[in-house]
Each structure stands twice: as C-alpha cells, then as structure tokens.
Amino acid sequence: MSVIKMADLDLAGKRLFIRADLNVPVKDGKVTSDARIRATIPTLKLALQKGAKVMVTSHLGRPTEGVFEEANSLQPVVDYLNASDLGVPVRLVRDYLDGVEVAENEIVVLENVRINKGEKKNDPELAKKYAALCDVFVMDAFGTAHRAEGSTYGVAEYAPVACAGPLLAAELDALGKALKEPQRPMLAIVGGSKVSTKLTVLDSLSKIADQLIVGGGIANTFIAAEGHPVGKSLYEADLIPEAKRLAAATNIPVPVDVRVGTEFSEIAPATEKAVSEVQADESIFDIGDKSAEELANIIKSAKTILWNGPVGVFEFPNFRKGTEVISNAIAEATANGAFSIAGGGDTLAAIDLFGIADKISYISTGGGAFLEFVEGKVLPAVEILEKRANG
C-alpha cells in the first residue's frame, strides 16, 4: 500500500493540517475516555520535533452543520492536551476557514470540522479552504477513513502534499499483517448484537480465517440455527439460513453452556446452564465456563488473532466472565508469540476493563473503518492518499 508517510517528510517550517480522530466522550466539560487523544499525541510530538507549524482538527459528536454548540466543541480536548506532556501551548481557533496564523512551538486545534457547512458531503469549496491552510495535509484518523468527507478526502485532493500520519500508517501495516499474510492458524473473533450488521465481515473472514468464533447476539443466532431454544434472547430468526451456511463453510464452535438472566439489568442474577436448557422467559447474556474454557484453548493455539466484539454483556459484572476469559487467553497467546489485533468500541472498552492494553499486539482505533477494511472494501481516505502518492 504505497502512500507518502509523514515520518519520511522534511517538515521544517511547513504548515501541517492534521486530521486526527479526537472524537472522545465528554461529560461536564471533561474527557471521560482519553484513548484516542493518547494515540494522537505521538503524531503531534513528531510534527513538533520536525519543526512544523502544527494545526490539528477532528470531529466530535454529531453537531448540525453551520451551528456551533458548546457541547460539540473540542475545548475539552484542548484542555486535556494543555495538561499533557506536549510541552507547548495548545489553543483553540473557532473561525479558521479564511486563514489562521500558526507559530512553531505551539499547536492550534481547529474547531470541530462537522460544524463546517459541506463537511459531510465533501463540498469541494470547503475542501479547498482546508487545503489553503496548509503545505502538507496529514490524514491520521483511521476511524473516519471509510468516509469521503471534506476533512478526510476532499482536502487530500487539493493540498500541496497529502500523506498518512504515523497512526494511520501503523493501522494499515497491522491490518495488512493480519489479513494479507497471516501466520497460521488464523482465528477471528466476532461479537456484537446482530449478524445482519456483521454478515459481510463474517463472510470475508470465513474465507481468510482457519477458525471463527462468534459471540454476543450473533452467537445466539448460531445457537438457534443448531436447533437450541434461545428464550427471549436477542437473535435474528430470518438469518438462521445464513448462520447455517457460514457454519458449514468454516469451523464455528457453538457454546455448550451459557449464562442467562430474566431481565437486562446490572443486578439481574446469572444462572449457568447447558445451552439446550434455556427457558422461554430467559435471555442468554454470556457464555458458560465450559464454553469459555473451550474457546480459550482454541485462542491459545492460534498464531494470528483478529478480535472484534465481546462474547457477552461484559458491562454487567454477572455476565462478564466469558469476555474476561477470552481477553486473558488472547493476552496469553500474544505473550507466546501470536500476533493479535483488536478493534471496535466495545472491544476497546473490554481491553480497558481487563487491563490488557499492553498485552495485545495492535489495538485499532477504528470501528466502522476497521470492519470495512476487514470486509475488503476500499477506504476512500486511503485511496486518495494512494492516488496522490502515485501521481
């Protein structure tokens, strides 16, 4: 995948427009989960080291274009960066489309791009305004690479130079390693609530992986496809034929035991039982101990592991164990030489909860983009960087 890399460029005195992914949760004006900001800080440090004049921007939330609301401001991100170890002042600029002054040894955060009219539909006039701000455009937001928007695609068409930031370059390298030339056996773990939203992912992975593990609501549809009762569990009856087709094409173990509850709540008691014994008023919220152990053994024998999604409602302590066992097995396999890559919001939350971030080979910051790459789709923001790199 040939793109120009920011790390390879001479950036002294150059104006840099970095499109990062700083879309973080904010409560009462404070950042509540800083993973995406932490992932971006090395890019900012590299830009400063190279003597660039640094501008960085992102989307945050879903504001109405043309309407500024404090709730969608990047101010909490600026506050976070000012308290970090960047060592230079960070300031927020709200009106920047007609030009902005940037000095060396400072970082200018350009206010939420989604407030700009034409951002989402990639208006060329807006893209040209972004491009006019810089000498070099740096795309470093893998999480939005599947969207052709003004700040992810359009600006890359018009900027004098368009390149991939360190984070995006690392994402592409890691995903390429997992999907293009995986060490065998390759295992893919796909969780989540619905087969329908992950069907193309499951299809693509069934062709690459030696083994597929399904979890969450997806697993319930596979359980139902085997003829077991699923009670009130979330599942998709109309996708049972698809589940059967996938199960016939790839090795997909179905849980032998499960943890059930009679209501979806943090305090609902969990009952462990054989998968064939789920009652009409019960819902499956996690896998049982036997199933977790079986899956852990499969995981520990894999050489490449792609992980997207938990195997249960791990947010509730009573239904956490399955995902915890799986998480620890992935960490152990990685310690023993496997290459592991994890992506998706719920997966990252599980990694944080179980404290295994440093035990996974690569953690992808992209949700939708991660899945689309896995599906084999072309990511527009990467495609335009390739086009610019290759004349």
From Swiss-Prot:
Reactions mediated catalytically: (2R)-3-phosphoglycerate + ATP = (2R)-3-phospho-glyceroyl phosphate + ADP
Pfam families (UniProt xref): PGK
Subcellular location: Cytoplasm
Chief location: cytoplasm
GO CC entries: cytosol
GO MF entries: ADP binding; ATP binding; phosphoglycerate kinase activity
GO biological-process terms attached to the record: gluconeogenesis; glycolytic process
Residues binding substrate: D21, L22, N23, R36, H59, L60, G61, R62, R114, R147
Pathway involvement of the protein, from the record: Carbohydrate degradation; glycolysis; pyruvate from D-glyceraldehyde 3-phosphate: step 2/5
Self-association and partners: Monomer.
Similarity-based family: Belongs to the phosphoglycerate kinase family.
PANTHER family in alphabetical order: PHOSPHOGLYCERATE KINASE, PHOSPHOGLYCERATE KINASE 1, CHLOROPLASTIC-RELATED
Name of this protein: Phosphoglycerate kinase
Gene: pgk
